[in-house]
Structure formats: C-alpha cells, structure tokens
C-alpha cells in the first residue's frame, strides 16, 4: 500500500511534467484548456434606475400607500407562495405554480409524502418539460397550462389592449381577491438584461402610478415597483420567435374539481389526433366505427386519457368507475378490449362532445353519439368529464393560436 501511495503522486507529477495542458485542481487531474472553457457565472443583477426595489426605503413607502388604497388584496397570498423558477426558462412555470398555490387550487396529485401541492415540474400538459426547459412557454401555452390545472383565464395580447384597459385590469386584479394577473414582458424596456419574461403582479399604487412585479427569477432581480406606463410599453417589443408582441393573463379559480384523470396529449399530439379523427369522420357508419378509431389511436400512441401522475384517489373514484361500467358507451368498447375501458370511454365522451368534431359527423352518426352523450348526465361522470373537456378546449385553442401572441424565447439571455 505504501508503494501505491508513493507511486500515485509520482505518476501525477510525471503527467504534469510530460503534458503542459494537464494540472491539479482540488486533487483532480484536469485540462487547463477545460478550465478556460468554464462558463462565466453571475450572482444577481443590479436593478436599473427605472425599477424601485420593493425592499428599499422608498419601495416600502410605495407599498404603504398602495396598502392604504386597497390595491394590495392579492399580495399576501402571493407572498406566501413566492418561488424561484426552477430553470432559466421556467419563468412561466414558476409564475403559474406560484399563482395556483396562491389561489389554493388542489392539484389532486401527490407532491411529496402524503401532501398534494403544486410543483413546477407538474406543469407539462401542453408541452414536454424538456421542450419548455429549452425555450419557455408562449402566452397561449401559459393560458392552456392554467386551464388544464383548474384556472379560468382571460388572455390579452397588448396589441389589442389600450393603456386605459390595461390600467383597469391592473386595478381589478389588485382590489379583488382570487383574481391575479400574470404578465409577459420584455426586460430590455425596463433597463434590465435579458429579454422575454413572465412574473405575477403583486399590487398597484394609484398615487405613485407604479405596479409591483414579483419577479420569479429571484437569483437575478428582486421584486420591484415600476411605472405602469413603462410596464405597458414593455409588452410591445416583437418577440423574435413569433413576430408578435407579448401580453398578460387574468387568472381566477375555475371551481371545478380537477379529478384523477387528465388528457394524456399535449398540443402537438392533440393536433394530430383531432386531424385524424376529422379526416375519418365523414366516412364512419356508426358509433362502433368511431370507437374503433379511438382504440387504434389509443393503442398506437400515448393514452388519450390517463391518471394524473401520483394522483390521490379515494373510494369515490371506484364508485365513479362503477358508474362508467353501467353505461352503453362502456360496453361499446368492451367488445373490442378489456384494458382501461373506463378511460377510453371517457375519451370518447370528451372528444365527441366537441362541436368541431360533431360538425364533421354524418347526421345519423351524430344522432347516435348524442344519445350516448346523455349518459354523462350522471353527476359522478359529469364532474370528471367537465375537467377533461376544459383541457381539450384549451389544447384546441392553443393549437389555433400557435403562431400568435408571444411564441416565447423566455429568459434565454442573462
């Protein structure tokens, strides 16, 4: 062993003497060339003069005035859920996660241990997290994610909104509990580094005409007050990825239980699935043909409907499945398969209740479908189905506006 201990340092000395590009850092052999290639790192950024630090003396004065004006109604619920975005391009996910927990939306799935709670890595219903990690989310994708997770949204692209309307929306969200604004803006207009970014709005001081931005990139900038007019202007610069300006979203709880089931498709796979169904719709003879189409799709791709990962189930869920098994639609599929029949039945009801699909069906088939759709009036089924239909509506809308307002390139620049 002593021979080995003496030999290793000798070997390393020999390597460093023989090869000038090799050295020791913390007892590890490394290439000096590799050291030169290490990424430059940063610790926070200085707020520009256009932004007033929330925790500064003047920032506290603005907060006090806004509080006295009654324009900080959502601040405290948001402050309790303040997060840092998990990845450089997760500003949209960080913002939405913060808002969902602030509005007390039950995700219906486990976070850790026995606790249900929203985490940024749960927000993947519109696009894969690996894609979002590369270039963030668009304004429409943000809305889609919010809808899929139990929020009602109104999305506004700044090119369609006057300053007065924006001001009214800011005041509304600052004075009404359970109504929060998420804003997508260009940092450069505020004198900051970087480009596109999402963050929640924490309040408004009418006397100072300043809006509070609760920046989710806490590793970079603190929370700050900024002039309302400047904030409005920060949404106008054209996003290079889309050729469109940015905007904002007004969010409120939907008051519809999310349930255990979720749509297994993202906006891209739903676009392909709906296109295939529409192409086949005109030639079908009966509901059984439609069932065969759905089964072929379900078997060749990811499931149309699936359980939320780590979902929290109760005895009510088993009763819900028993209700499905009592329907004609369930037995329509049971003739073809005995695997996850309850879930493909829910997919059938959700998809063929969409107006755009119904319009493509022959009259006789549509009448048969409408008869089967009456089975969803069972309350246990209808509750779960309503949430699934909302998700499909959101995915459909997101597909239609895919090249619309703010196809994001969030937070790519330091």
From Swiss-Prot:
Transmembrane segments: none annotated. GO terms for cellular component: cytoplasm; cytosol; nucleus. Residues 37-256 form the Peptidase C83 domain. The keyword Aminoacyl-tRNA synthetase does not apply. Pfam families: Phytochelatin (PF05023). One of its GO terms (biological process) is cellular detoxification of cadmium ion. Keywords: Cadmium, Copper, Metal-binding, Transferase, Zinc. It catalyses: [Glu(-Cys)](n)-Gly + glutathione + H(+) = [Glu(-Cys)](n+1)-Gly + glycine. InterPro entries: Papain-like_cys_pep_sf, PCS-like, PCS_N, PCS_N_sf. GO terms for molecular function: cadmium ion binding; glutathione gamma-glutamylcysteinyltransferase activity. Induction: By cadmium, copper and zinc. Its EC number is 2.3.2.15. Required for detoxification of heavy metals such as cadmium and arsenate. Belongs to the phytochelatin synthase family. PANTHER family: GLUTATHIONE GAMMA-GLUTAMYLCYSTEINYLTRANSFERASE. This is Glutathione gamma-glutamylcysteinyltransferase.
């Amino acid at each position: 062993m002593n021979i080995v201990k003496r030999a290793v340092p000798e070997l390393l000395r020999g390597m460093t003497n023989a090869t000038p590009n090799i050295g020791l850092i913390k007892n590890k052999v490394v290439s000096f060339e590799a050291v030169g290639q290490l990424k430059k790192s940063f610790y926070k950024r200085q707020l520009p003069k256009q932004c007033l630090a929330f925790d500064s003396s003047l920032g506290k004065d603005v907060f006090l005035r806004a509080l006295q004006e009654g324009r900080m109604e959502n601040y405290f619920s948001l402050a309790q859920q303040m997060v840092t975005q998990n990845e450089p391009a997760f500003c949209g996910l960080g913002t939405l996660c913060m808002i969902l927990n602030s509005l007390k939306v039950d995700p219906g799935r486990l976070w850790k241990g026995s606790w249900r709670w929203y985490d940024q890595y749960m927000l993947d219903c519109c696009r894969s997290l690996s894609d979002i990690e590369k270039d963030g989310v668009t304004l429409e994708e943000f809305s889609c994610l919010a809808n899929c997770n139990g929020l009602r949204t109104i999305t506004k692209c700044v090119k369609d909104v006057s300053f007065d309307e924006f001001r009214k929306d800011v005041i509304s969200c600052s004075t009404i509990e359970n109504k929060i604004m998420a804003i997508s803006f260009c940092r450069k207009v505020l004198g900051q580094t970087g480009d596109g970014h999402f963050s929640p709005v924490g309040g408004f001081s009418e006397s100072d005409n300043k809006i509070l931005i609760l920046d989710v990139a806490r590793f970079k900038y603190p929370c700050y007050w900024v002039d309302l007019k400047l904030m409005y202007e920060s949404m106008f610069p054209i996003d290079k990825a889309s050729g469109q300006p940015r905007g904002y979203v007004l969010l409120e709880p939907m008051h519809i239980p999310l349930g255990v089931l979720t749509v297994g498709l993202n906006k891209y796979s739903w676009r392909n699935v709906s296109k295939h169904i529409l192409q086949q719709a005109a030639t079908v003879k009966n509901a059984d043909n439609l069932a065969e189409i759905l089964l072929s799709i379900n078997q060749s791709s990811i499931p149309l409907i699936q359980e939320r990962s780590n979902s929290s189930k109760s005895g009510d869920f088993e009763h819900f499945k028993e209700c499905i098994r009592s329907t004609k639609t369930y037995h329509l599929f049971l003739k073809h398969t005995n695997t996850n029949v309850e879930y493909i039945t829910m997919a059938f009801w959700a998809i063929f209740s969409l107006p755009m699909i119904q319009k493509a069906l022959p009259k006789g088939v549509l009448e048969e479908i409408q008869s089967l759709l009456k089975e969803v009036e069972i309350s246990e089924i209808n509750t779960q189905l309503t949430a699934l239909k909302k998700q499909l509506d959101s995915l459909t809308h997101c597909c239609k506006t895919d090249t619309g307002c703010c196809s994001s390139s969030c937070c790519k620049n330091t």
